[in-house]
Amino acid sequence: MAKNMAPILHILVISLSYSFLFVTSSSQNSQSLYHNSQPTSSSKPNLLVLPIQQDASTKLHWGNILKRTPLMQVPVLLDLNGKHLWVTCSQHYSSSTYQAPFCHSTQCSRANTHQCFTCTDSTTSRPGCHNNTCGLISSNPVTQESGLGELAQDVLALHSTHGSKLGSLVKIPQFLFSCAPTFLTQKGLPNNVQGALGLGHAPISLPNQLFSHFGLKRQFTMCLSSYPTSNGAILFGDINDPNNNNYIHNSLDVLHDMVYTPLTISKQGEYFIQVSAIRVNKHMVIPTKNPSMFPSSSSSSYHESSEIGGAMITTTNPYTVLRHSIFEVFTQVFANNVPKQAQVKAVGPFGLCYDTKKISGGVPSVDLIMDKSDVVWRISGENLMVQAQDGVSCLGFVDGGVHTRAGIALGTHQLEENLVVFDLARSRVGFNTNSLKSHGKSCSNLFDLNNP
C-alpha cells in the first residue's frame, strides 16, 4: 500500500511545486505590469500640465490635447474665456469610446443645453452626426461665428507631474465636448488647429471638468511663451502646494514676486480684473473714477459684460484692445513721453509706431494699476513694443472702437512670459509685477515639458 502511494505523493508534490511557481510568477508579472502601466482616472494627481505653443502667423496660442481611443494628439486654440472644448468631427475622427448622449439626458443638463440635435449631413451615423442627441452651440472666438453641433463624450488625457518632472498620463474616460461644424475652423485660427479649448467659468469647460473629476483645487496657472519655437504651459491645480511647486523651477523666486487682485466673472463666464488707472512714466492716463473711461453699471452705452471690472483677460486677441476713448488718451500720453522725431507712419493694426533705431535707449513702461495703488501690472520691453516691420517698432495696443466687450481686453502679447494664476477658489488673479524676463527667466525654462 505504501509502495503504491509513493508515486502518487511524488506526482502531487511536483504538481504543487509547479502551481506555486506559476502563482508566484503570475503575481510578479502582475505587479510589474501594474507598476509600468499608465495611471487611469482612478489615480488622483496633484497637478496636471498642458504644454502650449505660440502660432507664428496669428500670434495666438494653441496646444495638443490627447483624446479618443486609441489616444491621439488633437491641436486646439487656447480660448481662456471659452465655455467648452469643441473640435470638428466630420473627417478622420476614429474612436472606439465615442458616445453621443441622448437628448434630455443627464449629460445635456450638465452642459446646460436643452436643445435636441438632428444631423442632416449624412444618412450614416458617425461622430458628430447622430439623431436625438443634445445640441450645443460653439463659437470661433476670433471671427465670432457660431454653429450648432453635437454634444459628445470621449476619453481625454493629460500629463500629471512627478516632482520636478512631467509625469505619466491620467484620463477622464467620459469627457464632455462638442463636435462642431467644420466652417468654424476655416477663418481666423492657426492653420493646424481642429477646434478651441475653452477655459472659461462654465459647467463643462476643461478646468471645471478636471476639478470635478480629480478633486483638484479650483485653480489654474497660465504661462505663455513669446516664441513659436518654445513651449509655455497651463497648470491645473494648486501651484502653492508644497507637493506641487517643485515642478516650477526656481519657484520661490517666481512665486514670491506675485501679487493678487480680485477676480470678477461675467455672466458669460469671462475673466475680468479691475484696472482703476493706467500710468505712463508717472503720468496718469485714466483717473480712478472717470465714467467716460469705465462706464458705471447704470450706463446703457455698453453691454453689461463690458462694465464688469474694467479689464478682460483674453487669449484670442494677439494684442491688447482698448476702447476708443481710452486708446486716444493713452497713445497721446505715451507719445508725449517719447521724442517726437522718433515717430513714423503707423503700421496696421497699430496706431503709434517708431523708428526702432531712434528708440534704442528705451521707451517708458506702462503700469496697469489694480484695485489698490500698490498692486501694479508693469508692461515693458518686448511685452510693450511689437516689431511690425524691419526698423519699425509699434506700441502693442489696438483701437477697438466705441463698442467693445471691455474697456480693456488684455491680449496675449502683454500676457507672454508672465505667470498668471486664476485662483477660482479665492476669486483672485495672481501675476508677476514684472515679466519673467526681467528676472532672467522665461516660460520655456520654468517647467520640464519633456515626456517621461
From Swiss-Prot:
Applications (biotechnology): Being internalized and phosphorylated in liver hepatocellular cells, stimulating pancreatic insulin accumulation, and exhibiting hypoglycemic effect on human and rat, may be used in antidiabetic therapies and diets (e.g. lupin flour or enriched pasta) for type 2 diabetes (T2D).
Signal sequence extent: 1-33
Glycosylated residues, chain numbering: 131
GO biological process: negative regulation of catalytic activity; proteolysis
Keyword Secreted attributed: yes
PTM per Swiss-Prot/TrEMBL: Glycosylated on alpha chain at Asn-131; identified N-glycans bound are Man(2)(Xyl)(Fuc)GlcNAc(2), Man(3)(Xyl)(Fuc)GlcNAc(2), GlcNAcMan(3)(Xyl)(Fuc)GlcNAc(2) and GlcNAc(2)Man(3)(Xyl)(Fuc)GlcNAc(2).
Major localization listed first in the record, in broad terms: secreted
Keyword terms, alphabetized: Allergen, Disulfide bond, Glycoprotein, Secreted, Signal
Residue numbers marked as site, Cleavage: 296-301
GO cellular component: extracellular region
PROSITE patterns in the record: PEPTIDASE_A1 (PS51767)
Site-annotated residues for Required for inhibitory activity against GH11 glucanase: 439
Location of the Peptidase A1 domain: 61-432
Any GO molecular function: aspartic-type endopeptidase activity
SUPFAM superfamilies, sorted: Acid proteases
Induction remarks: Secreted in high amounts upon heat treatment of mature seeds. Strongly induced by chitosan in the cotyledons of germinating seeds.
Pfam family, one: TAXi_N
Keyword Secreted found: yes
Subcellular localization(s) per the UniProt record: Secreted, Extracellular space
Known tissue expression: Expressed in developing seeds and in the young roots and cotyledons of germinating seeds and young seedlings.
Subunit structure: Two-subunit monomeric unit made of alpha and beta subunits coupled by disulfide bonds (at pH 4.5 and under non-reducing conditions). Monomeric alpha and beta subunits in reducing conditions. Can also form oligomers including dimer, tetramer and cyclic hexamer (trimer of dimers) (at pH > 5.5). Component of globulins complexes which accumulate in seeds. Interacts with flavonoids (e.g. apigenin glucosides) present in globulins complexes.
Role this protein plays: Sulfur-rich seed storage protein that remains undegraded at germination. The uncleaved form exhibits some inhibitory activity against GH11 xylanase from T.longibrachiatum, more at pH 7 than at pH 5.3, but not against GH12 xyloglucan-specific endoglucanase (XEG) from A.aculeatus. Binds to model phospholipid membranes containing dimyristoyl phosphatidylglycerol (DMPG), dioleoyl phosphatidic acid (DOPA) or mixture of dimyristoyl phosphatidylcholine and dimyristoyl phosphatidylglycerol (DMPC:DMPG), or mixture of dioleoyl phosphatidic acid and dioleoyl phosphatidylcholine (DOPC:DOPA).
Similarity field: Belongs to the peptidase A1 family.
Extra facts: Resistant to pancreatin-mediated digestion.
Name of the protein: Gamma conglutin 1
